[in-house]
């Protein structure tokens, strides 16, 4: 177990409790970039262990340094909305897919040179079309910037009308019929409005902080994804959820990579929702591979590192790994292995760390494997600014975490 962890400058992350001097561990995006390290942070632990508090604190710290944030909010209470409303001096946008007041239609929120490609990816997933099939080829043609300009296609709704009434390309009306299924609020509920309602103003992706509420979005389970029969019978709202998570991941890449002179972070609590969509997982893979060159973070929260990070590329590129309270021996063992400790080559250290993971000392306490693979005991810092601390609390007050 190490006494010195993390960086010596940057954003204060935690007190290294294993150190006699109670030193601080810092996260430093620019130092990681210069050292050719990845920019991914993963918090592992049971509900109430302190993951979300830490994610929100990093959000505020990055925003205070002039960075940009895009985050998902899967909570019933809209806890991320509450938190970002406590951050002063930033432009924020809230897109709540359960009660949409802003549109996420890629043809409305992105410039024409990007919009068609992102919309094509979204619609291929939503409509379950093959990229090089007849319908997929038609979709690619009508979403080219010049074609959209010539035919005044400025929204997904307008695209559907064009395909249904004005387009002579093969299978155009069949594509329009498929879109109509998902654009029907009786089939897709509020998700239909979030993309296809022309009366909603478009979300502003240039905002300093963009929160996308994902509460209530249903996704296919593992059995449905693996069974062709069950997959074909998926209800529209589950198909829509799968496509929407992939769209969010692609939007995050565009937002966070848009200005390489400015730090940015994509924050995903409850990461299993994102990784359960194969298309979203692929987009996350691309994000992680390229994030170092763009000065962009990926910050995630998870209960189970083995199940929630099935993409080996993403898992191997996570440089900062924090394991907090685990509620059973199986998850504690997975957590310690996730830290890089091998139970076969280091059985005594492994057993000792599993005991810590099962009883780390309270919310925010746990183990940290830093960018060099050093592992030590820590206590995560809570926000020092009282309004942030109060707004960040998604549980009863945690009196045993320090602030900074």
Go through each PLM region and give its residues.
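Conserved beta-strand scaffold positions in the cores of enzyme catalytic domains, especially
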Residues: 69-71, 89-94, 209-211, 321-323
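Conserved P-loop NTPase motor cores
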Residues: 30-61, 70-79, 98, 227-349, ...
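Conserved P-loop NTPase
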Residues: 344-399
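Short conserved micro-motifs at the rims of enzyme active sites and ligand-binding pockets
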Residues: 104-107, 221-225, 333-335, 379-381, ...
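P-loop NTPase motor domains
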Residues: 1-24, 74, 85, 102-289, ...
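Basic- and hydrophobic-enriched, low-structure N-terminal and domain-boundary segments
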Residues: 1-39, 383-385, 395-404
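Conserved SF1/SF2 helicase motif Ia
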Residues: 65-67
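P-loop NTPase switch/communication element
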Residues: 76-106
């Amino acid at each position: 177990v190490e006494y010195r962890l993390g960086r010596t400058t940057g954003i204060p992350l935690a007190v290294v409790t294993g150190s006699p001097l109670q030193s601080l561990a810092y996260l430093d995006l620019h130092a990681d970039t210069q050292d050719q390290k990845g920019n991914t942070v993963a918090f592992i632990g049971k509900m109430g262990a302190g993951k979300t508090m830490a994610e929100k604190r990093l959000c505020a710290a990055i925003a205070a340094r002039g960075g940009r944030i895009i985050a998902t909010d899967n909570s019933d209470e809209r806890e991320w909305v509450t938190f970002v409303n406590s951050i002063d001096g930033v432009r924020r946008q809230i897109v709540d897919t359960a009660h949409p007041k802003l549109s996420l239609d890629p043809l409305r929120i992105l410039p024409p040179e990007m919009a068609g490609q992102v919309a094509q990816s979204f619609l291929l997933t939503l409509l379950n079309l093959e990229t090089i099939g007849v319908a997929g080829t038609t979709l690619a043609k009508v979403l080219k910037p010049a074609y959209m300009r010539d035919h005044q296609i400025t929204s997904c709704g307008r695209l559907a009308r064009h395909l249904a009434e004005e387009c002579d390309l093969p299978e155009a009306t069949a594509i329009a019929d498929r879109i109509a299924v998902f654009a029907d609020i009786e089939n897709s509920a509020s998700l239909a409005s979030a993309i296809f309602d022309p009366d909603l103003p478009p979300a502003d992706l240039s905002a300093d902080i963009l929160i996308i509420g994902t509460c209530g979005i249903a996704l296919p389970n593992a059995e449905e994804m693996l069974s062709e029969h069950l997959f074909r019978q998926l209800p529209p709202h589950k198909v829509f959820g799968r496509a929407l998570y992939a769209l969010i991941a692609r939007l995050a890449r565009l937002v966070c990579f848009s200005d390489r002179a400015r730090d940015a972070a994509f924050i995903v609590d409850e990461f299993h929702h994102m990784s359960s969509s194969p298309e979203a997982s692929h987009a996350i893979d691309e994000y992680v591979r390229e994030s170092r060159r763009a000065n962009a973070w990926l910050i995630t929260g998870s209960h189970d590192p083995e199940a929630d990070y099935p993409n080996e590329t993403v898992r191997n590129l996570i440089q900062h790994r924090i394991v907090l309270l685990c509620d059973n021996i199986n998850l504690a063992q997975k957590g310690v292995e996730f830290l890089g400790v091998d139970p076969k080559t280091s059985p005594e250290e492994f057993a000792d760390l599993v005991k810590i993971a099962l009883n780390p000392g309270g919310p925010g306490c746990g183990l940290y494997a830093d960018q060099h693979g050093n592992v030590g005991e820590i206590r995560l810092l809570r926000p020092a600014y009282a309004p942030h601390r109060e707004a960040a609390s998604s549980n009863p007050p945690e009196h045993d975490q320090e602030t900074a």
